[in-house]
UniProtKB/Swiss-Prot annotation:
<feature type="modified residue" description="Phosphoserine">
    <location>
        <position position="1119"/>
    </location>
</feature>
<dbReference type="GO" id="GO:0008187">
    <property type="term" value="F:poly-pyrimidine tract binding"/>
</dbReference>
<dbReference type="InterPro" id="IPR036390">
    <property type="entry name" value="WH_DNA-bd_sf"/>
</dbReference>
<feature type="modified residue" description="Phosphoserine">
    <location>
        <position position="66"/>
    </location>
</feature>
<dbReference type="GO" id="GO:0045727">
    <property type="term" value="P:positive regulation of translation"/>
</dbReference>
<feature type="region of interest" description="Disordered">
    <location>
        <begin position="1542"/>
        <end position="1673"/>
    </location>
</feature>
<dbReference type="GO" id="GO:0048027">
    <property type="term" value="F:mRNA 5'-UTR binding"/>
</dbReference>
<keyword id="KW-0496">Mitochondrion</keyword>
<dbReference type="InterPro" id="IPR045180">
    <property type="entry name" value="La_dom_prot"/>
</dbReference>
<feature type="compositionally biased region" description="Low complexity">
    <location>
        <begin position="179"/>
        <end position="208"/>
    </location>
</feature>
<keyword id="KW-0963">Cytoplasm</keyword>
<dbReference type="GO" id="GO:0005829">
    <property type="term" value="C:cytosol"/>
</dbReference>
<feature type="modified residue" description="Phosphoserine">
    <location>
        <position position="111"/>
    </location>
</feature>
<feature type="compositionally biased region" description="Low complexity">
    <location>
        <begin position="1299"/>
        <end position="1317"/>
    </location>
</feature>
<feature type="region of interest" description="Disordered">
    <location>
        <begin position="1298"/>
        <end position="1318"/>
    </location>
</feature>
<dbReference type="GO" id="GO:0000001">
    <property type="term" value="P:mitochondrion inheritance"/>
</dbReference>
<feature type="compositionally biased region" description="Low complexity">
    <location>
        <begin position="437"/>
        <end position="493"/>
    </location>
</feature>
Amino acid sequence: MSSKEETPSTGGAAPVATVAASGSATTSYANVVQNLETKKSGTSNTTTTTARATVDNKENQPNLKSFKSWSEEAAAAEAAGESPIVGSVSLAQTGEKRAAASGGDNTAENSSELDDNNDFVPVLSHHRRDRKKARKEKPRDQQPAGGRGDGQKPQQAGGRRVPGSSDTERKSVRPRAPRGGSPRKSAAGAAGAAGSNAGAVSSAVPGGPKVHKDRKDTSPSASIEGAGSSGNEAKSADGDQQAGEKGAAGAAPPPKRFIAAPPPKVNAWKISAKQSGSPKAGTSPLDKRVLQPKAQQQQQQTKQTASQNNNAQNTASNKKTQQQQQPQQGATTTTQTTTAAAAAATAAAAATAATTSAAAATSSAAAVPAATTETATTTTVDASQADALAKVVVKDKKKVNQKASDFSNVGDWPTLIGGTSGSGKATSNEPKRNPTKKQQSAKTAAAVAASSNTTSSEVATESNVAGTTSSSNSNPSSSTTTTNTTTNSQATTAPVASTSHDAKAQRDAEPAANSAAGTTGTAAGPALTKKIPKHKWRPLPIDLAKSSRPKPIGGRPNRRFSDDIADQRRPPRVYHDRQPGAGGAGVESRHPHAGRHPYGSRPATATSERVDSWRSSSSTTTAAFDEQRSGAAGGAGAAGTGVGSATRGPRRYRTPYRGGRQGRGGFSRQGPGRPTYRIPRHLLASGEYANYLPADAAGADSQSSYVLMGTHYFGNVPAAYIELDANSIKEAIKKQVEYYFSVDNLTGDFFLRRKMDPEGYIPVTLIASFHRVLALTTDVAVIVNAIKESDKLELFEGYKVRTKTTPTTWPITEVPEVNEGEPKAIGTLEQEQLEQNDGQEKLEEQTEADSPPPILTSAMATKPLNSIPPPPMPRNPQNLVPKMLQDKQQSRSSTIAALNSVNAISALTQQVEGGAAELAGHLSGLAESVKPKSTSTPDKRNAASAGNGAGSAAALVAEPEGIWKEVKRRSKTNAIKENATTPPQQQQPPLSQTLNNNNDNVKTNNTSSKSKSSSNNAPSNASSSATVCVTTNNASSATKATTKTTTTSTATTTTNNNIKSGNAAYSKTHSKSSSKTAAPPSAQCHAEKEELDFQFDEELMDPLPPGTGRINNFTENFSDDDESDYEFADRDINKLLIVAQVGRAPKHEGYDRTADFTSRTKITQDLENIINDGLVNYEEDLWTTTNVVADYKTVNVISQADFEKLAGGRNKSVLPPQVVPPPPPFEEDLDETLVGDTTLNSTLNNTLKSRRARFYAAPNSHSIDPRTPRKRKLRHTANPPVEAHVGWLLDTVEHRPRTTSMGSSAGTSPTASSYGSFGSSVPQSLPVFQHPSHALLKENNFTQQAYHKYHSRCLKERRRLGYGQSQEMNTLYRFWSFFLRENFNKSMYNEFRSLALEDAGNGFRYGLECLFRFFSYGLEKKFRPNIYQDFQDETIADYETGQLYGLEKFWAFLKYYKNGEKLEVQPKLAEYLKSFKNIEDFRVVEPEINEMLQGVGSLNPGRQLNRHRSVSESDGTAVIAAGGRRLNTTITNRSDYVGRLLQQQHQQQQQQQHHQYQQGYGGYNQQQNRRRTGSFGSTTVRIRSGSLGNKPQVANRNQGSQHELRRGGSNSGLAPHKRQQQQKPKPGAGSQTGSTRATTSAAATATTAASAATSTAATPAVTVSSGSSSSKK
């Protein structure tokens, strides 16, 4: 890496080395050799390096915990390392900030500045600020990198080494791990070294000027590194030393600025030391690339130490750091640490000597040949360590991700590079590579360093920084690193490239660099000091940033987690390196990333580099790109990052996060989350998976801390957070699923148990949907494989799983179980028959017979969706279904078997019929027909059997005939009784049908199974005939059949028939009489129609042909379904409870119908909704307790506790009967519970539909705009009717009316009224139900009363008070108008109509208007042809009497009904409608204002009114185009009124049809957009705005304001002369706002109106949504 980095440093860090290594600027091997020679010759440089090492030691002595200010670090680096580098390159440059001079190493020297500039991000500094600064400085650094800023000739020619050659050298010569002992040092020294490394790498890999890469190492570390390894200076004390040595000790490195860095909680220094030890590691994942074999590193370090006191000091600190790291890494690491520390010190000196490249190269070379030269040795040590680190990193590349994942390094986060954990990782990872690569790299690096000492000096510095980082990271595996070093020398740059890791590496390396490079110590120390407090940014290493970070293009998907030393240690990102890299070293700096090679080094060592760092994924392939992106600066940054940085180097994670990378410190989240294959954060958050992490990923350092989910944690990072391998994930899944099926869990997991089929199986997909499993994997195949490996779970057909221990004891079934004995016998028969059939079927049958309890055989249970099990809870007894299936199979298999099974089947069928048929009610959502005797099942069976005999059986089981019934809404009370009685009655014929169906099934199964028995043939025939019948039914049920998708079309047809006609009897009954299998097709079809064992409520109350619409086909007969939904049974009418407001008893008879004697509560829309919900909840409560309550013939209301006791006892008593196999008990149970439940559910499902309003609030007022022409309706009269709130709910029992006027004989039970009911003949206060509405209702005198009682009272009052005089009767009219819209009952409708017409005939039209509202809105909701005809008839009659309300409602219906244009209108009515094109046309009554002003003589026909007309409700939106004034449309409660231009309105009035149409403000065009809202009481939003009741009416009735619209609507009804008056513009526009009082003179009024009209023209367009409420009214 050193040489590599050094070579790239030509772009940035290398510029320092450029002077010394101008010749070596070329990436040629000669340059590397020259660098090495330069290092060797640079003993003085070594001295400088020693000084730098001393500085580094100072830094490292605090274990990098006390971060010196970056300025100090920079100064020290400049003094110690920069001077040597500059000496090589130019002392002046060293004196100057290398950042400025070299843009690479200069930056490194000015690491503090660079730090501030975001160029240098020492590993130690975790400050986000530092990181940010680094990024900020990148461009600046890069520019210097582009050409040495301080006058050093850019080493493009010389210092910059040709990217190719320089890279090659660098790559070949991995900078020795600059002092494995001191990450910071290495970082500092590596600032030069790593900077060089970065530069070298960048130049080597992408070619010096990958400014972008450098930029990518935007994190302060990277930036600093990029800036002439200024960032690395802190880290690259070694780098600077190397640079000094290498470049020339000519100029003492300027005193490094030490930035106080938060003391790493973890031994970040150790990590950094490793990094510094292996610049190459910088290129390759620093963490992974451990220094060369510990012995070599130690020797080298020792040599370095010997040659450099400072280095020795640094070594000590490095040792501390490395030791800290090493403890994590292990004893070897410790030894390496010591050696690395010495080596780091030596390397720091060497690096200082301008051996940044050379040193790094030498380190790489020397890693193999430990004693390249004293100077070289120093460099070599650094290079060796760097090389070892690089190599280790390279090897660790594989583990790089692991280390990245490793949060153990996180503990070292203060170093950000996570050297400690990284080192641990590096040790294990790097040793793998070290043996070969490290030595080779070391040798190569030495050669490269020699050739490119001058050029590499800065690069070397960076390289060393990286190397130092790498040393920290990779010292333990330095031997491996050695081999890798060669690669890493190239890769060193790449390691620098990893931004996140670089930042970490740099930070870590900075401590290492401080220790390793006394020279760098100044920069590194300050960085360490300054950065110490900044642990907080460490949390960012989490993968969070990784996702954001550019993925390593070629880099390993795996990145080390925080644990990755290289990652954490990565010399502070190649930020500084970038800067130098920008110049020349910058290229290399970038390539330090490349050197690290995960990113930048892709070209040369990218792959190998990448191996070391999971970040290398970003570094190796991305390094090149990143370096390119970062440019020279990025390269320098990468190199500066050194090994650590290189690992992460090029990957400047330009993430949405601040600081480029997510990481606060500028290094993106390193370890944990960066791997390409990140572990979900939630997984990362749990340590339980730690053991699943790769060694690298796992927290290698106990001291390391890690950030997870944005939170910083101290201690080893759970490996699980890092990454789980496939086996670990599989194991975790297996354990999780085993837990789901464990006794401990199942005892309380009722959800899971309810999802089980009778055999205890649960679809794997359900398990896969659990969050804990999803957290592990989303691949069902993985889950299936994990389940297969479990010895506690059993998987069937790959899609269902259950526990192996007593699986059938867990399913919670609501269906009574049939005796297993019969099923067994049947199963045996079936087995015999099946033996003749396909073996699979036989096996299936045998399984069933053998284990009667399990309905599904393993195969069956696991049948894929073909035979989707019914709902999770099998509705039918577990055994019943299999038995039935078996019976069917038997019948098909052999006639005899069929006969035998028929007996059993008949019993089972009877039992199943009642239970399953009604259970089907629970499955109302399922589209299976209730009647598919065996048809639907056979169809599915056919499909299944075609695939597999057993499969077919499974399919059958999965779809027990009874299971797939579709049950329509039932009458709540009668359903129970009906079910109890009907099932037996209907079961008999259905059984034969069922048998026929079974035969069909058998035929299907036979076809698929190819079993050959005469019985099968007969069934086939039967099924064929049945199919034919079904086909007849198919028109409606075809869709259902299609839904079922069976193997054969015939089966499908049968399924359709079954679906259609199949009801409770569908499967239950058909199994009863297998002997009837051969029933004639016609008979079967007929039987199918009659197959239902019960009638739907609609059928009972309004008999419908069995095959008409009652058997709802989900896909076809939507209207039928809707119709049933909107039907209301007569017997349910008797259950109605009316909730009405009861006023105080009148003091005298003869009410003033207009008197509001009842203090009606003003109910807003919100309150209305609350009350409606309360009634719904109340009703649900009634029905949930109904099953029990209905049985108790008590009038008394019992407490809830008593009720529960009673109910509980009853339930318990009932449950045992369910278990009882015999059909009779079963039927009894069904009668009580199953039927009741089904009825209850079906009824509730329909009656409690959210769309059904329970409370119809009355409009608060009928205020009408006095200026608006009115309609001929009661609400627009001077004395509008008083309307009352009314609500309803459905009781659980019937309240039989004393008279038969309303009560339907159907379903009326003589004792129904005797049931203690909440409804009673006398109004009762509402029972307490837990809902806010209860208090509202009670406070406002709402009482509940049985409907028939209330109805009879209203009629009584009507008779007593006379037509139209009864308020209660009016309330009843209103109730009918709303209730019948969604709950149509023919008898109720007929009564409503007759009474309304009777009242109308006597001059009281309220009832008739309610009737018209029902017509209009009810037909819109559910079109009924007979009602539509009545609507037309009544409309014509009403119009012919001179009324317009009926016509208005008909007009509105045609307009708003979705199919209105398709309706046929009677010619006479159509003729009447021709004159009404707009809702305004119905406003024929003069405005109320005229009546008010009649006493004022000035009111003349031609007089103009002040009021602004509002468009009638029919106008959807009125756009007032003229003028800035808005028309005064104050009535907001009516959507009808939209202010319009008076002129337009006037024109409308003048030419209602013409202009309204033309202008478009007329009703039709705009009305199309209007929504008609429902009546006030309706909770559902209606497309039409209904009667006022639909929404809270705000009476904005400002008597004095003529501009205020009255509820009545717009002016359009004004007489033409009035319109003309309105049109007249007058100055009094203000009158629009002002209200003209009735007392105002007519003239004033006219003036106001005129002005209003004028203003209207000027009024800006105002869009008002008008409700069609007026049209509705």
